[in-house]
Amino acid sequence: MPNSALQHRTVRTLASAQVLSGVGVAGTVAAGSLLVSSITDSETLAGLAQTSAVLGAAALALPLARLTARGGRRLALSVGYTAGAIGSVFAILGGAQSNIFLMLLGTFMVGAASAAGYQARFAAIDLATDQTRAKQLSFVVWGSTIGAVTGPNLMQPAGNLAENFGLPRLVGPYLISAMTLALATIVIAMFLRPDPYLVANKESVTKLEKGDTKKALKHIRNNPKALFAILSIAIGHVAMVSVMVMTPVHMAHVDVTLTIIGLVISIHVLGMYAFSPVVGALSDRLGRVRVIQIGLIT
């Protein structure tokens, strides 16, 4: 298969998986904070769910990267999405039994699906040309927009589904998450063939160096652009996640329905991702650093 055709197939497959994982992960953000608040009877602790999920994504990012180096993107992404699906089951059990340990273990493992979703974006550029690299990555990000906007709007029907199984309404989004992340695993396992990472590594004149976590961190410390990128992500996420996590709690405090809470989170997520193709095109045209600077200012 020519690389151009393989690249188009790869992007379509990754975008499809991102739609499914987006539905699952985004739908659990509001539900997770509300569940933790309900279990602990404390609004102050509501942020623990998202904190646990973010820690899970961070902790599992490098292990998934090592899996990629050993066996390719298909292996790493499949493991990440599968771990997320299992985590959703733990969160369901934690919510049903009012067990905060199981709940936070579940949200931690759902973080693996987030880590896989982030790595799926970079899988889109394994075979991309320098001229279209950011644009192709942004299409996969945009694919997650569909799922991420849809997921929070399923809170009400997901709650109804949970009640039909005799479960608390707030675990409903985790039922959806378990199903959609399992489907994302199937999509990756069946259609991400041949593996873009393995193809790119085989055709590369310079073989990719396999290192450990210590070497990776040392490389980041010695790379100003990498440090700039990490700092930019950290600043953006502090503002974004703080608003995203606490808004549902405050809305629930004044008896806003799950339907409206889901709609508000969907609008927030739409703002996060909807313009990613435009940002990608601007990055190819103006440069990555300049676009990041514009984003931080705005």
Which positions does each model-derived feature cover?
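Pair of pore-lining "gating" transmembrane helices in MFS-fold secondary transporters
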Residues: 4-37, 108, 221-242
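Short amphipathic helix-loop junctions that connect adjacent transmembrane helices
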Residues: 31-43, 245-264
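Juxtamembrane intracellular "pre-TM" segments in multi-pass secondary transporters
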Residues: 1-8, 193-230
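Hydrophobic core of transmembrane alpha-helices in multi-pass small-molecule transporters
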Residues: 19, 100-115
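C-terminal ends and interior cores of transmembrane alpha-helices
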Residues: 82-97, 298
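Glycine-rich segments within core transmembrane alpha-helices of 12-TM secondary carriers
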Residues: 135-155
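C-terminal membrane-cytosol helix-exit motif in multi-pass small-molecule transporters
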Residues: 151, 155-160, 178-203
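Helix-to-loop junctions at the C-terminal end of transmembrane segments
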Residues: 60-73, 159, 274-288
